Every structure is written in structure tokens, then in C-alpha cells.
Amino acid sequence: FFVTPKNGEIKHIDEFVKPEDVKFLDPCMGSGHILVYAFDVLMEIYKESGYTERDAAAMIVQNNLFGLDIDDRASQLAYFAVMMKARSYDRRFLSRGIKPNVLAIKESNRMGAVVRDGLTTDAEMNAISRYLVDTFRDTKELGSIITVEPKDYDGYMAYLDGCDGQGQLTMEDADWLQNTRPMLKALARQAKVLAAKYPVACTNPPYLNKIEGRLKTFVTENYKDYSGDLFSVFTYRNLMFCKQDGYCGYMTPFVWMFIKTYEKLREFIIRNKSITTLVQMEYSAF
């Protein structure tokens, strides 16, 4: 999908980009406003490539849009918004069993033993279980600023599906199957989203300059140069979500451009990235 520039100059076109490869992440999706707008843009890209609206809607939900948020209610609204947007292009979409990659971030704080003798016997898979539980401590507070290592999360989820047990199960085994296993699968699914790299990452990050508790400790330890405000942390983190030559978009306060608190952020962007568009909003926009 290509729009000719107004000046008529065409410097470079990657003719081999497929629509399904244009994966779009909003790591602070809220109720999904940005995802819904991206859906319409992606729909035009698919239609330009010869897809029907019905097929494109399914492809966008399955392959293109990814969203995360720590707020369960906001995530439910985002889920609903994406599904209704797909439904607007395909009347039977809700009956097709397609689930969007729109997730409420979960944490592992209340999880007990994750390995059951006789049910989980694969050492590599058990190591992933322990990694997930350790990584997702306090993530209802930390959200998507955590970093996750890429692992075989698809294989891990398939492995969990095969841990059904045979014959008579103990109460502990039954509890693992009914409660622990679904949570591990949910953690693996969000780990897969957080570990991936995206051609496009766009968000309206949270604004918070008085950070306290576990979040303050984590930000100080991992994002000290960008800790003046939570939006600054997310600005940096979003860049880490992007593939090389990918695009990041933000709706943030404009103070990062001027005051000393955000000097390290400005230096990082200027020295390592390229700004294609910069719009200074009216103060009343916030």
C-alpha cells in the first residue's frame, strides 16, 4: 500500500512487504481507540492488496493488531471495540471463533507450585514455567515496561495442552489442571507479545511524575535516565518494541522537548533514531 508524496518524489519503496507482516502494537491500549483507528488503516492496506473486507477483517484481528493494558476493564472495552470494528466489515465475524490479541496483563503473584510430578516432566518446559512466574511478579503495577526474553512460547502452550494427566488424579493435580495451567498459558501468551518486535508501535502512554512503591524501584533500576515521568519511560520502552526501521508514534506532553528532566531522552532519540513528524499540541489538548 503506497501513497505518492505530494512533492512527487519517491525515494524508496519496499515492494515485498505483505499486509499480514505489518504488525501493530499498542502497549498501553486503554480502551482501544488507537487500535480501532489502526484497524481502518490496515483495512485500506489489505483492500489495496486485493483482499475482501471479510477476509481482511479476520487477518487484521489474527495477525496485525496487538494490545496490552494493566486495567482489566479497559482491556475488556478494547476487546469489544476491536471485535465490533471487525463485525462492521463482516456481519458473521463473531461466529467465526477468532480472538484478538488484546490482553489484560496478568501477574503471577498468587501462583503456587507450577510443576506437577507426572504431569510436567519436560525440563525445558518446566524452566519456562519458572521463568514466567518470576518475570511476571507485580506486573499489574509494572505493566509493559518489563522486558521479556524470546522463548518457544507457542511450543510451551502446546505442551501445556498435552498435560491432561491419565487415570486417577490427586486433588493437587486437578487444581493444577483447572487453575495453574490456564494461568501459565495466559502468562505465555502475553510473554509472546512482550518479547516480539514490531514494525509499528504506537501509544498514548500514562503520564505520572510521582512514582512510588514497586514501580519506582523498578523504574529507577531499569530506566533511570528516563525516570522523570512514566510517559518518558514508555517513550524509551516503545522504541525497544520496534524492529529496525520500524515506526513509533506517541501522544505525549511536549515538555520532553524542552526541560532538563528529559535531556537524556532527547539525546537518545537524536543520536539513535530519526524523527519524521513532530507536532506540538496546544496545552489544552491534555
Q: Residue ranges of each PLM-predicted region?
A:
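Short, solvent-exposed loop/turn segments at the edges of secondary structure
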Residues: 60-61, 97
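Short N-terminal helix-initiation segments at or just after the protein's N-terminus
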Residues: 7-13, 45-50, 135-146, 240-241
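Catalytic palm active-site di-aspartate
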Residues: 62-65, 252-253
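Signature of N6-adenine DNA methyltransferases within the class I
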Residues: 36, 43, 70, 75, ...
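Basic, amphipathic N-terminal segments
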Residues: 107-183, 190
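Conserved SAM-binding loop
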Residues: 26, 67, 250
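Flexible, glycine/threonine-enriched loop-and-boundary segments that flank and lead into catalytic domains
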Residues: 1-23, 170-202, 214-216, 220-221
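Class I S-adenosyl-L-methionine
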Residues: 1-60, 74, 205, 209, ...
